[in-house]
Amino acid sequence: RSIFSFVRKSPTKRNNLLFVVNYTPVERSDYRVGVPKKKQYKLIMDENGLLEKPQTFKAESKECDNREFSFAYPLAPYGVAVFTY
């Protein structure tokens, strides 16, 4: 699908970052991404820049991308999303 995600772990294991990049012109209104922990993920930045009011998404026990947990959110065409957890 030409959508890539990766995690940047902090040395303290707090404030880790999850990046999701959509390299296609297709909007994904309910894109599901696999995540390493069943936690809340806060969307802090997207293709428009830093968010004044970050949105929070709760991971659920639903396998995706070879990960035990995942959550769904809207991903813009050629969009970028950065989450902290």
Residue ranges and their predicted role:
Residues 1-85:
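Carbohydrate-interacting/catalytic domains
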